[in-house]
């Protein structure tokens, strides 16, 4: 992965203009880790970051929204997960990106777990990271990177992160994982076709499925 990060950073540094980078993928795919590694190699004084989690409709509301979908010849009904496009406030995110692109300062959305911060137009790079990126207009971005992993790796990572860091019940996590993964396969995975770089990232390693370099 270090070689991939190096190529991405070299491309960004050589771009020569203001740049918008979109990084997306399902939960526990490694997108935040990739974003952090890229930022470490760039000048912080010239870099903005928008994490798109605040643009996702909260699970406390989504749990009341049941959707039906067909998968491999079988009908399923389950609550709407963040892998469904309707779970995302895409228009506000697209507006905020467009504001920065037009030279306007803005503030990120404040939440109980993150403070609102300034996104300065004078900075040269805007990095937008999170699931919502996949459902926005791909033409907004100058470079788009998508990560995903297999279902087993995702569950393993979620078991560590969501249980230890977020207090999620392990039995609930395992029960909901299958339907979450099915919704991912139907609604989100096809969006990778809109990205310049596609990386399959698992505990066994990574594979570049597509690269613009």
Provide a role label for each language-model segment.
Residues 40-49:
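Post-Walker A helix-loop "phosphate-sensing" segment adjacent to the P-loop in P-loop NTPases
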Residues 1-15, 156, 160-164, 182-213:
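NTP-dependent small-molecule kinase module
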Residues 20-24:
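Short hydrophobic/aromatic beta-strand immediately N-terminal to the Walker A/P-loop
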Residues 34:
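Hydrophobic positions on the alpha1 helix immediately C-terminal to the Walker A/P-loop
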Residues 116-164:
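ATP-dependent NMP and nucleoside kinases share a basic, alpha-helical "lid"
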Residues 31:
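Conserved lysine of the Walker
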């Amino acid at each position: 992965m270090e070689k991939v990060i190096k190529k991405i950073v070299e491309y960004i540094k050589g771009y020569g203009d203001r740049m918008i980078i979109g990084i997306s993928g399902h939960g526990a795919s490694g997108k935040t880790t990739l974003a952090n590694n890229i930022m470490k190699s760039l000048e912080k004084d010239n870099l903005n970051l928008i994490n798109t989690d605040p643009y996702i409709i909260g699970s406390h509301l989504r749990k009341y929204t049941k959707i039906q979908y067909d998968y491999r010849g079988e009908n399923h009904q389950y609550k709407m997960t963040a892998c469904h496009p309707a779970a995302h406030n895409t228009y506000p995110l697209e507006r905020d990106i467009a504001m920065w692109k037009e030279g306007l300062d803005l503030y990120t959305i404040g939440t109980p777990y993150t403070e609102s911060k300034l996104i300065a137009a004078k900075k040269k790079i805007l990095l937008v990271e999170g699931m919502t990126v996949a459902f926005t207009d791909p033409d907004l971005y100058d470079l788009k990177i998508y990560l995903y992993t297999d279902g087993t790796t995702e569950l393993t990572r979620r078991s560590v992160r969501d249980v230890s860091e977020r207090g999620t019940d392990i039995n609930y996590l395992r029960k909901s994982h299958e339907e979450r993964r099915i919704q991912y396969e139907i609604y989100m995975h096809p969006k990778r076709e809109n990205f310049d770089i596609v990386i399959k990232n698992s505990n066994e390693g990574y594979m570049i499925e597509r690269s613009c370099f």
